[in-house]
Amino acid sequence: MKPENKLPVLDLISAEMKTVVNTLQPDLPSWPATGTIAEQRQYYTLERRFWNAGAPEMATRAYMVPTKYGQVETRLFCPQPDSPATLFYLHGGGFILGNLDTHDRIMRLLASYSQCTVIGINYTLSPEARFPQAIEEIVAACCYFHQQAEDYQINMSRIGFAGDSAGAMLALASALWLRDKQIDCGKIAGVLLWYGLYGLRDSVTRRLLGGAWDGLTQQDLQMYEEAYLSNDADRESPYYCLFNNDLTREVPPCFIAGAEFDPLLDDSRLLYQTLAAHQQPCEFKLYPGTLHAFLHYSRMMKTADEALRDGAQFFTAQL
Protein backbone atom coordinates (compact mmCIF):
# COMPACT_ATOMS: atom_id res chain seq x y z
CA MET A 1 0.00 0.00 0.00
CA LYS A 2 1.42 3.38 -1.00
CA PRO A 3 1.66 5.37 2.29
CA GLU A 4 -0.42 8.22 0.87
CA ASN A 5 -3.32 5.78 0.39
CA LYS A 6 -3.53 4.85 4.06
CA LEU A 7 -6.17 6.35 6.33
CA PRO A 8 -5.24 9.67 8.05
CA VAL A 9 -5.34 7.91 11.41
CA LEU A 10 -4.11 10.76 13.60
CA ASP A 11 -6.98 12.92 12.32
CA LEU A 12 -9.56 10.23 13.05
CA ILE A 13 -8.69 9.04 16.56
CA SER A 14 -10.72 10.13 19.59
CA ALA A 15 -10.01 13.29 21.58
CA GLU A 16 -8.66 11.33 24.55
CA MET A 17 -6.45 9.24 22.26
CA LYS A 18 -5.09 12.47 20.72
CA THR A 19 -4.29 13.75 24.21
CA VAL A 20 -2.22 10.62 24.83
CA VAL A 21 -0.41 10.93 21.49
CA ASN A 22 0.42 14.58 22.25
CA THR A 23 1.58 13.95 25.82
CA LEU A 24 5.26 14.78 26.14
CA GLN A 25 7.61 13.47 28.80
CA PRO A 26 10.27 16.21 29.05
CA ASP A 27 12.86 14.01 30.78
CA LEU A 28 12.58 11.23 28.20
CA PRO A 29 15.28 10.92 25.53
CA SER A 30 14.25 10.32 21.93
CA TRP A 31 13.42 6.80 20.75
CA PRO A 32 16.70 5.04 19.78
CA ALA A 33 15.51 4.00 16.31
CA THR A 34 18.97 2.87 15.25
CA GLY A 35 20.01 1.66 18.71
CA THR A 36 20.53 -1.87 19.93
CA ILE A 37 17.58 -3.95 21.08
CA ALA A 38 18.87 -3.56 24.65
CA GLU A 39 18.70 0.24 24.29
CA GLN A 40 15.19 0.03 22.85
CA ARG A 41 14.07 -2.18 25.73
CA GLN A 42 15.53 0.28 28.23
CA TYR A 43 13.74 3.18 26.53
CA TYR A 44 10.42 1.31 26.52
CA THR A 45 10.71 0.64 30.25
CA LEU A 46 11.51 4.31 30.95
CA GLU A 47 8.69 5.58 28.71
CA ARG A 48 6.10 3.36 30.43
CA ARG A 49 6.93 4.58 33.96
CA PHE A 50 4.73 7.65 33.54
CA TRP A 51 1.78 5.55 32.36
CA ASN A 52 2.14 3.03 35.20
CA ALA A 53 1.93 5.59 38.00
CA GLY A 54 -0.99 5.64 40.41
CA ALA A 55 -1.98 2.00 40.13
CA PRO A 56 -3.85 0.38 43.04
CA GLU A 57 -1.78 -0.96 45.93
CA MET A 58 -2.13 -4.63 46.83
CA ALA A 59 -0.11 -7.55 48.14
CA THR A 60 2.56 -8.37 45.56
CA ARG A 61 4.98 -11.29 45.55
CA ALA A 62 7.77 -12.28 43.16
CA TYR A 63 8.95 -15.81 42.45
CA MET A 64 11.45 -17.41 40.10
CA VAL A 65 9.92 -20.43 38.38
CA PRO A 66 11.97 -23.32 36.94
CA THR A 67 11.56 -24.22 33.26
CA LYS A 68 13.64 -26.37 30.91
CA TYR A 69 15.13 -23.13 29.59
CA GLY A 70 16.10 -21.82 33.02
CA GLN A 71 14.45 -19.64 35.65
CA VAL A 72 11.60 -17.32 34.65
CA GLU A 73 10.50 -14.39 36.80
CA THR A 74 6.85 -14.18 37.85
CA ARG A 75 4.96 -11.57 39.84
CA LEU A 76 1.76 -12.24 41.80
CA PHE A 77 -0.82 -9.53 42.44
CA CYS A 78 -3.23 -10.57 45.21
CA PRO A 79 -6.21 -8.22 45.73
CA GLN A 80 -7.78 -10.47 48.39
CA PRO A 81 -6.81 -13.59 50.38
CA ASP A 82 -9.58 -15.79 48.96
CA SER A 83 -9.30 -15.40 45.20
CA PRO A 84 -11.96 -17.16 43.09
CA ALA A 85 -9.43 -17.91 40.31
CA THR A 86 -5.92 -17.19 39.02
CA LEU A 87 -5.32 -15.19 35.84
CA PHE A 88 -1.98 -15.44 34.03
CA TYR A 89 -0.98 -12.24 32.23
CA LEU A 90 1.34 -12.11 29.20
CA HIS A 91 2.62 -8.69 28.26
CA GLY A 92 2.80 -7.31 24.75
CA GLY A 93 5.76 -5.69 23.00
CA GLY A 94 6.12 -7.48 19.67
CA PHE A 95 7.82 -10.46 21.38
CA ILE A 96 10.99 -8.34 21.64
CA LEU A 97 10.11 -5.63 24.21
CA GLY A 98 8.31 -5.37 27.53
CA ASN A 99 8.49 -6.87 30.99
CA LEU A 100 6.56 -7.03 34.25
CA ASP A 101 7.28 -3.36 34.99
CA THR A 102 6.03 -2.01 31.64
CA HIS A 103 2.63 -3.65 32.21
CA ASP A 104 2.41 -3.21 35.98
CA ARG A 105 -0.63 -0.92 36.01
CA ILE A 106 -2.55 -3.14 33.58
CA MET A 107 -2.01 -6.18 35.81
CA ARG A 108 -2.89 -4.31 39.00
CA LEU A 109 -6.12 -2.95 37.55
CA LEU A 110 -7.06 -6.35 36.18
CA ALA A 111 -6.50 -7.88 39.62
CA SER A 112 -8.47 -5.09 41.29
CA TYR A 113 -11.43 -5.27 38.89
CA SER A 114 -11.63 -9.08 38.84
CA GLN A 115 -10.65 -9.62 42.49
CA CYS A 116 -8.64 -12.57 41.19
CA THR A 117 -4.96 -13.25 41.70
CA VAL A 118 -3.05 -12.11 38.61
CA ILE A 119 0.31 -13.70 37.82
CA GLY A 120 2.53 -11.91 35.33
CA ILE A 121 5.02 -14.18 33.56
CA ASN A 122 8.24 -12.58 32.36
CA TYR A 123 8.76 -14.95 29.43
CA THR A 124 12.11 -14.73 27.63
CA LEU A 125 12.07 -12.17 24.83
CA SER A 126 13.06 -12.66 21.21
CA PRO A 127 15.39 -12.90 19.39
CA GLU A 128 17.20 -14.48 22.36
CA ALA A 129 14.30 -16.94 22.64
CA ARG A 130 12.71 -18.38 19.52
CA PHE A 131 9.27 -19.91 19.05
CA PRO A 132 7.91 -21.89 20.87
CA GLN A 133 10.10 -21.13 23.91
CA ALA A 134 7.87 -18.38 25.32
CA ILE A 135 4.79 -20.64 25.15
CA GLU A 136 6.67 -23.50 26.80
CA GLU A 137 7.83 -21.19 29.59
CA ILE A 138 4.25 -19.99 30.16
CA VAL A 139 2.97 -23.58 30.28
CA ALA A 140 5.78 -24.54 32.67
CA ALA A 141 4.86 -21.65 34.98
CA CYS A 142 1.20 -22.72 34.96
CA CYS A 143 2.16 -26.30 35.80
CA TYR A 144 4.49 -25.14 38.56
CA PHE A 145 1.85 -22.99 40.26
CA HIS A 146 -0.75 -25.74 39.84
CA GLN A 147 1.53 -28.20 41.62
CA GLN A 148 2.53 -25.68 44.31
CA ALA A 149 -0.84 -23.95 44.71
CA GLU A 150 -1.17 -24.80 48.39
CA ASP A 151 2.34 -23.59 49.22
CA TYR A 152 1.74 -20.28 47.43
CA GLN A 153 -1.82 -19.95 48.77
CA ILE A 154 -3.39 -19.43 45.35
CA ASN A 155 -6.55 -20.89 43.83
CA MET A 156 -5.55 -22.89 40.76
CA SER A 157 -8.80 -24.83 40.43
CA ARG A 158 -9.92 -22.23 37.87
CA ILE A 159 -7.47 -20.26 35.77
CA GLY A 160 -7.42 -17.88 32.85
CA PHE A 161 -5.00 -16.30 30.41
CA ALA A 162 -4.87 -12.65 29.43
CA GLY A 163 -2.62 -10.57 27.23
CA ASP A 164 -2.28 -7.55 24.98
CA SER A 165 -0.89 -7.52 21.43
CA ALA A 166 1.79 -10.25 21.16
CA GLY A 167 0.79 -11.25 24.68
CA ALA A 168 -2.74 -11.94 23.44
CA MET A 169 -1.37 -14.40 20.90
CA LEU A 170 0.69 -16.05 23.65
CA ALA A 171 -2.38 -16.19 25.92
CA LEU A 172 -4.56 -18.03 23.41
CA ALA A 173 -1.66 -20.16 22.11
CA SER A 174 -0.91 -21.30 25.67
CA ALA A 175 -4.55 -22.22 26.31
CA LEU A 176 -4.65 -24.23 23.06
CA TRP A 177 -1.31 -25.87 23.89
CA LEU A 178 -2.69 -27.07 27.25
CA ARG A 179 -5.83 -28.38 25.53
CA ASP A 180 -4.02 -30.13 22.69
CA LYS A 181 -1.37 -31.76 24.89
CA GLN A 182 -3.95 -32.60 27.58
CA ILE A 183 -2.03 -30.87 30.36
CA ASP A 184 -4.10 -30.24 33.48
CA CYS A 185 -3.38 -26.89 35.14
CA GLY A 186 -6.91 -26.33 36.40
CA LYS A 187 -10.06 -25.49 34.46
CA ILE A 188 -9.47 -22.67 31.97
CA ALA A 189 -12.43 -20.41 32.71
CA GLY A 190 -11.62 -17.72 30.14
CA VAL A 191 -9.09 -16.00 27.91
CA LEU A 192 -8.88 -12.19 27.67
CA LEU A 193 -7.42 -10.89 24.42
CA TRP A 194 -6.74 -7.21 23.79
CA TYR A 195 -5.83 -6.28 20.17
CA GLY A 196 -3.81 -9.40 19.44
CA LEU A 197 -2.31 -10.85 16.30
CA TYR A 198 -3.39 -14.39 15.57
CA GLY A 199 -1.77 -15.36 12.30
CA LEU A 200 -3.08 -13.27 9.39
CA ARG A 201 -0.42 -12.59 6.78
CA ASP A 202 -2.35 -9.72 5.17
CA SER A 203 -5.67 -7.96 5.68
CA VAL A 204 -7.63 -4.81 4.91
CA THR A 205 -6.68 -3.19 8.22
CA ARG A 206 -3.01 -4.13 7.78
CA ARG A 207 -3.12 -2.25 4.46
CA LEU A 208 -5.11 0.81 5.52
CA LEU A 209 -3.58 1.34 8.97
CA GLY A 210 -0.22 1.28 10.74
CA GLY A 211 2.49 3.91 10.81
CA ALA A 212 5.17 5.67 12.84
CA TRP A 213 2.62 6.42 15.59
CA ASP A 214 2.11 2.74 16.47
CA GLY A 215 5.18 0.89 15.15
CA LEU A 216 2.98 -1.46 13.13
CA THR A 217 3.85 -0.90 9.49
CA GLN A 218 4.15 -4.02 7.33
CA GLN A 219 7.93 -3.75 7.75
CA ASP A 220 7.60 -3.52 11.54
CA LEU A 221 5.33 -6.58 11.67
CA GLN A 222 7.76 -8.54 9.51
CA MET A 223 10.64 -7.58 11.82
CA TYR A 224 8.78 -8.79 14.93
CA GLU A 225 7.91 -12.06 13.21
CA GLU A 226 11.47 -12.69 12.05
CA ALA A 227 12.76 -12.07 15.57
CA TYR A 228 10.22 -14.46 17.12
CA LEU A 229 10.10 -17.43 14.74
CA SER A 230 12.83 -20.04 14.32
CA ASN A 231 12.23 -20.66 10.61
CA ASP A 232 9.78 -20.05 7.76
CA ALA A 233 7.82 -23.22 8.54
CA ASP A 234 6.86 -21.79 11.94
CA ARG A 235 4.60 -19.27 10.18
CA GLU A 236 2.08 -22.08 9.64
CA SER A 237 2.38 -23.60 13.12
CA PRO A 238 -1.01 -23.88 14.86
CA TYR A 239 0.55 -22.07 17.82
CA TYR A 240 1.62 -19.07 15.71
CA CYS A 241 -1.05 -18.98 13.01
CA LEU A 242 -3.81 -19.84 15.44
CA PHE A 243 -6.27 -20.12 12.55
CA ASN A 244 -4.43 -23.34 11.67
CA ASN A 245 -5.44 -24.79 15.04
CA ASP A 246 -8.79 -26.46 15.70
CA LEU A 247 -11.06 -23.60 16.76
CA THR A 248 -14.23 -25.67 16.47
CA ARG A 249 -14.06 -27.42 19.85
CA GLU A 250 -13.18 -26.90 23.49
CA VAL A 251 -11.90 -23.35 23.10
CA PRO A 252 -12.20 -21.56 26.47
CA PRO A 253 -14.55 -18.55 26.53
CA CYS A 254 -12.75 -15.68 24.80
CA PHE A 255 -13.11 -11.93 25.33
CA ILE A 256 -11.76 -10.34 22.14
CA ALA A 257 -11.08 -6.59 22.24
CA GLY A 258 -10.32 -4.58 19.12
CA ALA A 259 -8.91 -1.08 18.68
CA GLU A 260 -10.63 0.81 15.84
CA PHE A 261 -7.46 2.13 14.19
CA ASP A 262 -5.24 -0.90 14.80
CA PRO A 263 -3.73 -2.64 11.75
CA LEU A 264 -4.23 -5.92 13.64
CA LEU A 265 -7.98 -5.37 14.01
CA ASP A 266 -8.87 -7.88 11.30
CA ASP A 267 -7.05 -10.60 13.26
CA SER A 268 -9.50 -10.02 16.13
CA ARG A 269 -12.50 -9.88 13.82
CA LEU A 270 -11.55 -13.12 12.09
CA LEU A 271 -10.93 -14.86 15.41
CA TYR A 272 -14.35 -13.80 16.68
CA GLN A 273 -16.14 -14.78 13.46
CA THR A 274 -14.42 -18.18 13.43
CA LEU A 275 -15.25 -18.98 17.05
CA ALA A 276 -18.82 -17.71 16.76
CA ALA A 277 -19.44 -19.73 13.58
CA HIS A 278 -18.56 -22.89 15.50
CA GLN A 279 -20.56 -22.04 18.62
CA GLN A 280 -17.49 -21.49 20.76
CA PRO A 281 -18.20 -19.03 23.61
CA CYS A 282 -16.82 -15.61 22.72
CA GLU A 283 -17.49 -11.90 22.88
CA PHE A 284 -16.07 -9.17 20.64
CA LYS A 285 -15.96 -5.51 21.58
CA LEU A 286 -14.59 -2.69 19.45
CA TYR A 287 -13.25 0.40 21.22
CA PRO A 288 -13.92 3.42 18.96
CA GLY A 289 -11.25 6.02 18.29
CA THR A 290 -8.40 3.97 19.74
CA LEU A 291 -4.94 3.01 18.57
CA HIS A 292 -3.10 -0.24 19.19
CA ALA A 293 -1.67 -0.37 22.74
CA PHE A 294 -4.34 1.96 24.19
CA LEU A 295 -4.71 -0.30 27.24
CA HIS A 296 -1.55 1.27 28.69
CA TYR A 297 -3.10 4.72 28.96
CA SER A 298 -5.77 4.27 31.64
CA ARG A 299 -4.24 7.17 33.60
CA MET A 300 -5.64 9.44 30.92
CA MET A 301 -8.14 7.40 28.89
CA LYS A 302 -11.51 6.32 30.23
CA THR A 303 -11.75 3.92 27.29
CA ALA A 304 -8.63 2.06 28.45
CA ASP A 305 -10.06 1.69 31.94
CA GLU A 306 -13.36 0.55 30.44
CA ALA A 307 -11.60 -2.10 28.33
CA LEU A 308 -9.89 -3.51 31.42
CA ARG A 309 -13.15 -3.53 33.37
CA ASP A 310 -14.91 -5.25 30.46
CA GLY A 311 -12.30 -8.00 30.36
CA ALA A 312 -12.40 -8.49 34.13
CA GLN A 313 -16.20 -8.62 34.10
CA PHE A 314 -16.20 -11.18 31.28
CA PHE A 315 -13.78 -13.38 33.20
CA THR A 316 -15.62 -13.26 36.51
CA ALA A 317 -18.89 -14.04 34.70
CA GLN A 318 -17.37 -17.38 33.65
CA LEU A 319 -16.56 -18.40 37.24
UniProtKB/Swiss-Prot annotation:
Q: Where in the cell is it found?
A: Cytoplasm
Q: Which GO terms describe its molecular function?
A: carboxylic ester hydrolase activity
Q: Which residues form the active site?
A: S165, D262, H292
Please tell me which stretches of this chain the record labels as motif Involved in the stabilization of the negatively charged intermediate by the formation of the oxyanion hole.
91-93
Q: What does the function comment of this entry state?
A: Displays esterase activity towards short chain fatty esters (acyl chain length of up to 8 carbons). Able to hydrolyze triacetylglycerol (triacetin) and tributyrylglycerol (tributyrin), but not trioleylglycerol (triolein) or cholesterol oleate. Negatively regulates MalT activity by antagonizing maltotriose binding. Inhibits MelA galactosidase activity.
Q: How does it assemble?
A: Homodimer. Interacts with MalT and MelA.
- The name on file for this protein is Acetyl esterase
Q: Please report the organism this UniProt entry assigns to the protein.
A: Shigella flexneri serotype 5b (strain 8401)
Q: Which gene encodes it?
A: aes
